[in-house]
């Protein structure tokens, strides 16, 4: 057979014949009607229609006997009959299998109206079917565990309103921190000063000078009478609040310092900045303990009493967990695609959120597992995030948008827009820092129009006046 195949002559084709064949093929592919749909196939249409009827009416069977009408005073129920529906041609096998897979429904009551006798040849009762629910070929079985039923419903929160505006700074207000006693709070500004304000009255109590650049980070210790500040002048300072002066300075940053955090249980202060590292300092000795590197600027840092004790967010779009015992990275989160400019820990729960221009994401601790995105997209560069114990999270953007969220579900229940002060530009409506007081009932925002705004919940609001408009998502994103 092989020899015969080899000896068979190959038919030669002329160049003209090959050219005509190529032209014919091109016309078949690129003809003007190539974008039109082909004529429907009757056999395919019939099979598709039979399948749809089986899926929709697979649990119904044509009635064999007419249903008798019961007296309206009788307590007896109507006999169980099947709904009489016409089936497709040649669907005897489908109706036979439908009898075995009928929908389970309890006995139906007869109509109350005696005048409405109906057609005695048809019945609307449904037959019970044997077998478990998983054995039935019903289209609704796949909808039993839908996404909305499993998504947590948000709690109702009263809307927040602005009740006080503080003026005094001569530049953008970039940082804020509350006193542990909740009597005063401090703000740092681009005018290189730190101002201390009374929480109850909003009166300016003190102005501290010492930085030669804008103050980007503030923190007040709950274990000592110290306040820490960091700025664009590459300096980190420790202030004695009893003497109102600088008692220590921490030198080592090569560029401006963007963020600052205090460890809750150790005498350690953490600072991150433009030199792409987070530095760990000993408060008393002023020694640099560790240098925690990133690939770009470090914009946010968090400190926790348990592992991971240090969490940093960077311009390289990553979040890193650090082991403070050895100064080594424990994990790297790469869910974000943009700069991670702000992060916040929940005061009670073991979760934290990170804010970026692409989304606001919630992670669980200690492993950093992704929980979910917030259900709305704030189309701003988010500079500030804060969370209180009641589960109200607030985010502030560079365009003046102040959004309030439910922590549990990620539902955005309020969107507020700040109003710039007279004499300021519209571009100065950005929010650069936000912080709740120790009770979580008051909120302070620092803005680009050189003002500080204080917010509180609307006491007159009720669920009736401000109803909860919540729509659960249709799917969960995995990243």
Swiss-Prot record:
SMART domains: WD40. Signal peptide: none annotated. Gene3D superfamilies: YVTN repeat-like/Quinoprotein amine dehydrogenase. WD repeats lie at residues 168-198, 210-240, 252-282, 293-323, 335-364, 377-406, 426-456. Residues 458-479 are annotated as: Disordered. It comes from the Eukaryota. The keyword Protease does not apply. InterPro entries: G-protein_beta_WD-40_rep, Prp46/PLRG1-like, WD40/YVTN_repeat-like_dom_sf, WD40_repeat_CS, WD40_repeat_dom_sf, WD40_rpt. The keyword Disulfide bond does not apply. A motif (DWD box 2) lies at residues 310-325. GO terms for cellular component: Cul4-RING E3 ubiquitin ligase complex. A motif (DWD box 1) lies at residues 269-284. One of its GO terms (biological process) is mRNA splicing, via spliceosome. It holds the Pfam family WD40. Keywords: Repeat, WD repeat. Pleiotropic regulator. Belongs to the WD repeat PRL1/PRL2 family. The DWD box is required for interaction with DDB1A. This is Protein pleiotropic regulator PRL2. The gene is PRL2.
């Amino acid at each position: 057979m092989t020899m015969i195949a080899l000896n068979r002559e190959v038919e030669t084709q002329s160049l003209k014949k090959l050219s005509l064949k190529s032209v014919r093929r091109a016309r078949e592919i690129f003809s003007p009607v190539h974008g039109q749909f082909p004529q429907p196939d009757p056999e395919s249409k019939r099979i598709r229609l039979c399948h749809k009827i089986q899926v929709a009416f697979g649990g119904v069977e044509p009635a064999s006997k007419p249903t008798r009408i019961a007296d309206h005073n009788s307590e007896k129920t109507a006999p169980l009959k099947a709904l009489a529906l016409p089936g497709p041609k040649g669907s005897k096998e489908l109706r036979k299998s439908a009898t075995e897979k009928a929908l389970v429904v309890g006995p139906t009551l007869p109509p109350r109206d005696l005048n409405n006798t109906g057609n005695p040849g048809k019945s609307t009762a449904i037959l019970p079917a044997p077998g478990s629910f998983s054995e039935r070929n019903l289209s609704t079985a796949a909808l039993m565990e839908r996404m909305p039923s499993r998504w947590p419903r948000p709690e109702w929160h009263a809307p927040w309103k602005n009740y006080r505006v503080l003026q005094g700074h001569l530049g953008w207000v970039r940082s804020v921190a509350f006193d542990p006693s909740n009597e005063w709070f401090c703000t740092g500004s681009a005018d290189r000063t730190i101002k201390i304000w009374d929480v109850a009255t909003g009166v300016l109590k003190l102005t501290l000078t010492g930085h030669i650049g804008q103050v980007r980070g503030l923190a007040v210790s709950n274990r000592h009478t110290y306040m820490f500040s960091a700025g664009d002048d590459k300096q980190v300072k420790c202030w004695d609040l009893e003497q109102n002066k600088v008692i220590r300075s921490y030198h080592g940053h090569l560029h401006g310092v963007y963020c600052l955090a205090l460890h809750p249980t150790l005498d350690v202060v953490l600072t991150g900045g433009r030199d792409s590292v987070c530095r760990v300092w000993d408060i008393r000795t002023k020694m640099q303990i560790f240098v925690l590197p990133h690939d770009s600027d470090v914009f946010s840092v968090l400190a926790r009493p348990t592992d991971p004790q240090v969490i940093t967010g960077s311009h390289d779009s990553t979040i890193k967990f650090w082991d403070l015992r050895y100064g080594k990275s424990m994990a790297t989160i790469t869910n974000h695609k943009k700069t991670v400019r702000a992060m916040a820990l929940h005061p009670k729960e073991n979760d934290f959120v990170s804010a970026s221009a692409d989304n606001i994401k919630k992670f669980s601790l200690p492993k950093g597992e992704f929980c979910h995105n917030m259900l709305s997209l704030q189309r701003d560069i988010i500079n500030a995030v804060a969370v209180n114990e009641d589960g109200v999270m607030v985010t502030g953007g560079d365009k003046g948008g102040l959004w309030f969220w439910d922590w549990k579900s990620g539902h955005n229940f309020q969107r507020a827009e700040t109003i710039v002060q007279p004499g300021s530009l519209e571009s100065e409506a950005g929010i650069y820092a936000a912080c709740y007081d120790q009770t979580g009932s008051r909120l302070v925002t620092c803005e680009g129009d050189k003002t500080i705004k204080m917010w509180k919940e609307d006491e007159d609001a009720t669920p009736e006046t401000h109803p909860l408009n919540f729509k659960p998502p249709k799917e969960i994103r995995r990243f």
